[in-house]
């Protein structure tokens, strides 16, 4: 395939990535330039698929959204057989070839998006964790693979951090997800704390609800701490010095979202906590020092 076409496809993915707000850095300047393009390609692949599952601009039934995801899966298959034509998949095809990315990790992301279409309630925390295994954990593993790191212990610690990041996003986005008729707070926890779906829809900001979110935040903080050892493990990898800074910045960003939730006394029904520019600069300083 022509190098100019591959380069323009990577640029397309970069432009798409930079248009979207995220809590956490996506291929920041801490990532070496030669690695950054691969992260842009993976992000663009996942971002588009996520839009199929979520965005209101797509008309039609659940079946229509699932059909779009199946079509995306077909294009993923094509990129593994050298038949990619879409800019995202041209860039992704180069990425999976250069970084030896197993298709199963990318398919896991698509399975999470399918689940978003099919499922809107979770009976218990284990169900939520199972969702995170597809929606979040592959991302950390993909980043490690881009840096040519294949280590089961590191993968395990990365999974802890990625799950925690996904959970932090859930508690941050309770208000947003309700608009999509989606609740990630485990139903058995809601029963335990005396909170119903109706309470959430009516934005009933009770002490019971705040205690419920406090409980979710505390269990998420434990996962962040359990994954923190990844940074020490990575210090033994000469090729990952800058990656450590990137991952630590991401880790701090997730922790800061939880701090923002605490600062509003867990009232995520009325307010969506968000990192501002000052917060991000502060986190960068913490990462470097």
Residue ranges and their predicted role:
Residues 1-166, 171, 175-289:
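Catalytic cores of Mg2+-dependent Asp-rich isoprenoid enzymes
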């Amino acid at each position: 395939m022509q190098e100019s076409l591959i380069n323009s496809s990577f640029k397309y993915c970069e432009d798409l990535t930079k248009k979207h707000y995220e809590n956490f850095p996506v291929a920041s300047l801490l990532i070496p330039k030669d690695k950054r393009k691969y992260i842009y390609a993976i992000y663009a692949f996942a971002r588009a698929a996520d839009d199929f599952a979520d965005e209101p601009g797509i008309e039609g039934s659940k079946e229509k959204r699932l059909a779009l995801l199946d079509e995306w899966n077909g294009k993923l298959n094509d990129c593994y057989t050298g038949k990619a034509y879409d800019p995202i998949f041209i860039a992704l095809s180069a990425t999976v070839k250069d970084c030896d990315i197993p298709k199963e990790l990318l398919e896991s992301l698509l399975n999470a998006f399918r689940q978003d279409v099919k499922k809107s309630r979770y009976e218990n925390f284990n169900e939520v964790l199972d969702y995170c295994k597809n929606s979040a954990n592959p991302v950390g593993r993909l980043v490690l693979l881009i840096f040519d790191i294949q280590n089961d212990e590191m993968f395990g610690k990365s999974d802890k951090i990625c799950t925690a990041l996904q959970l932090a996003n859930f508690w941050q986005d309770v208000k947003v997800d309700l608009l999509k008729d989606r609740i990630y707070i485990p139903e058995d926890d809601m029963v335990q704390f005396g909170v119903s779906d109706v309470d959430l829809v009516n934005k009933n900001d009770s002490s019971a609800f705040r205690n419920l979110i406090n409980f979710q935040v505390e269990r998420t903080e434990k996962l962040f701490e359990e994954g923190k050892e990844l940074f020490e493990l990575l210090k033994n990898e000469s090729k990952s010095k800058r990656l450590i800074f990137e991952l630590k910045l991401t880790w701090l960003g997730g922790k800061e979202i939880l701090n923002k939730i605490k600062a509003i006394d867990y009232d995520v029904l009325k307010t969506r906590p968000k990192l501002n520019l000052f917060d991000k600069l502060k986190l960068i300083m913490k990462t470097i020092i």
